[in-house]
Regions:
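Glycine-rich, mobile lid/loop segments that gate access to catalytic sites or pores
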Residues: 1-71, 75, 87-94
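Terminal-appendage/accessory-domain detector
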Residues: 61-71, 78-260
């Protein structure tokens, strides 16, 4: 829920995934409300990490963090079934996740839950990725596909400026201040969150593949490196407004403007 937003406070979003998995397992097992409640609190407490795992010199932690909180969720259910309780109240308590880690007043938080047996609003508002790259970079790949039809010789390009919303700029773009996002030695976990890399490769190839687009041979091509270094991102107020001010998740503008 954006009403308990982890990202602005540099907390990894798997902090939501752990409790969500726990709730799902509890529902599948038809457990009673109190057992699920305690399991969710236990899971929430063991699923909070900083976003450093997604910044700087990345390791396989980024890839396996969802699996870890999934394991924590199973453990939480198992312990709750056996009578163990979680830290309570884990979110809104005086020393809980919200006041200590998220720095928000408890009374300002509103959580919209689906009606019983009603549509699962959280799932239905999810933006599904078409390409195997960062959430905020999918539209950039599509833009590269469109632009490559209009550019006769990529070697003549002097500069590429990408204007988009804040998250694209600071999470995947040059606004992250991560030099690794420009490095041909960077890991796949880094490059799938480099708007500069994915735009350059998509512009050259005209397709995106979940493995070959990140291979050592692909990322170390000299022509690609030259093009890659010419790409820079910028935060754009218009895209910010059309993304952050839109209440309907499926109507949020995900795109960008590209100047070549």
């Amino acid at each position: 829920s954006m009403s308990i937003a982890l990202n602005p406070n540099k907390i990894d979003h798997v902090g939501h995934l752990g409790p969500a998995i726990t709730g799902g397992i509890g529902a599948m097992l038809n457990l009673d409300e109190e057992t699920i409640y305690q399991a969710i609190q236990y899971s929430a407490h063991t699923s909070i990490f900083t976003r450093q795992g997604r910044k700087g010199d990345l390791s396989s932690w980024k890839a396996f963090a969802p699996g870890l909180v999934g394991r924590n969720a199973i453990d939480a259910i198992d312990r709750a079934i056996r009578g163990e309780k979680g830290p309570s109240p884990v979110w809104e308590g005086d020393y809980g996740i919200v006041p200590i880690l998220l720095h928000k007043e408890n009374e300002n938080i509103e959580i919209n839950l689906p009606e019983k047996n009603g549509p699962r609003s959280g799932i239905l508002s999810t933006f599904t990725k078409e390409h195997s790259a960062g959430y905020h970079g999918n539209s950039i790949i599509d833009l590269a596909f469109l632009l490559r039809e209009k550019i006769k010789d990529l070697k003549e390009i002097k500069k590429i400026n990408i204007y988009s919303k804040k998250y694209t700029h600071i999470v995947m773009g040059s606004g992250s201040n991560d030099p690794e996002k420009y490095s041909p030695e960077a890991s796949r976990e880094t490059l799938d969150h480099s708007a500069m890399y994915i735009f350059a490769v998509a512009l050259e190839d005209g397709f995106w593949h979940h493995e070959t687009s990140y291979s050592k041979e692909r990322k170390q091509k000299q022509e690609t490196i030259k093009l890659w270094k010419k790409v820079e991102t910028f935060e754009d107020s218009d895209f910010n407004q059309r993304y952050y001010n839109e209440k309907d998740p499926l109507k949020k503008v995900q795109g960008a403007k590209v100047e070549v």
